[in-house]
């Protein structure tokens, strides 16, 4: 691959606003991503009255499997042939608005031929005209829940509930990855791209040849199975056993002249978690087969307790007004893929010479927090309500990814490359990046909500109404800014991933005589999110805020032999809002995905 050369450039304020790039290589990528999901579930629930006790037993089993397929195909000219690319209208930031013009016509199937265009997998010895990833996930849950409830007269405590839950969850990820090679040819063989479709190449402004690669394995391509350090990292299994014993008392009393109802209780939760995976020494991974890239199977885990008290009270202020108070210790469990064992490691190729690696953490603890919630609610008979709520969560522990000091001695072999220079010369000590628990953080904010039927204004508007809510949430956790040269660097503060600062929902509706018609909009501000990269690994990125509009209409037959039958139609993302990623400026997106509108039509019958 030759270095690019910019010529015929127009420069304004230090920015090359237009020019021609030579030694440029055009690669037409046509991808297909799909999945087949299967879900089975069985449940059994039974209640039994024994004297003054009401008992219940609930048994459930569920199993979900998902087989995904990700075809990546490349087309263009042979590896040795170069092209040029002209561009205009660049101002230094508007990447998605630049106009590009290539020298060759990549919509011409005589130019865009299926082949190994770049020799990405190592050249003639390991040709790659595409890639096929087929991850397989199996997730099984078994659970039992036993409860017993009895009425009592212990002051404000009017009933007691005792319970026990036990959940067993097993999740595993495996699959097959491999290089696609043109069938029956040499390393850089070419094949015609089927069909005649063309499509615009992202935001480039020019068209390229397009096709659907499904069904091409065996007819156009043959598969060479592949394993390497990254692929081994996707093979893992996790077992989680959670036992919960709890006691709860129902409350009904009077405090400072205000009647209240609620509950108080405590849970004792025991967790036993085990993760499995593979360790790969990159120095020994010299190829992409199990023989040339050996791996070592490892398992690890942890056991721990959480004690979680809680209190919920609802005060009756009179005139259909209520004040609600909630206080509790809560936990939120880690994603199971973060609990996997296994890692890959090797000598750092940049910066300080030191062993570095990455993987999961079977000893990871959940998010732990203390929460306090306060809300005021005003009802208008059975017609509507308004409410205002404030909430605060003190994060005791949270989960983030960061490097930590680690001794790789148990995994070192005679072929492992150790640092030759610097402070870590000859040392098995290094840095290991994994999900880990941090301490301290806050989440707080408020929420306003209202449901207002228009019949409160006029009986002529009976059936019409509006629902609206708005939340404003601030959050922050501190992460150590860790680099190879300064392990204990300054801390940086970031918001909790996945959480928008502001979220607003609006729903206009008509509900009467069996008709339900609604238009809804959800607006959220930009946030720090997670997306899957080209290797199916989750990566943090900023997501631009969006407004999504949904429409729905249904009718339930009110009489006759079809009474109880409902017909419905729904349109989701009716305004076709795009999914936009960005780095610093939300008005300069780095990636755009248009998921389009989704329509649902259906019928149901209620017995």
Residue ranges and their predicted role:
Residues 184, 522-532, 555-607:
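C-terminal beta-signal and adjacent terminal beta-strands/loops
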Residues 170-172, 210-219, 232-235, 319-371, ...:
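Surface-exposed extracellular loop regions of Gram-negative outer-membrane beta-barrel proteins
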Residues 5-24, 84-128, 174-234, 293, ...:
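Flexible glycine-rich, low-complexity coil/linker segments exposed to the extracellular/periplasmic environment
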Residues 47, 51-56, 92-96, 151-160, ...:
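Short loop/turn motifs that connect adjacent beta-strands in outer-membrane beta-barrel proteins
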Residues 1, 59, 65, 124-131, ...:
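Signature of Gram-negative outer-membrane beta-barrel scaffolds
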Residues 392-394, 411-531:
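Gram-negative outer-membrane beta-barrel transporters
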Residues 50-52, 61-67, 75, 136, ...:
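Transmembrane beta-strands of outer-membrane beta-barrel pores
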Residues 28-39, 230, 234-241, 302, ...:
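Outer-membrane beta-barrel signature, preferentially recognizing the C-terminal barrel domain
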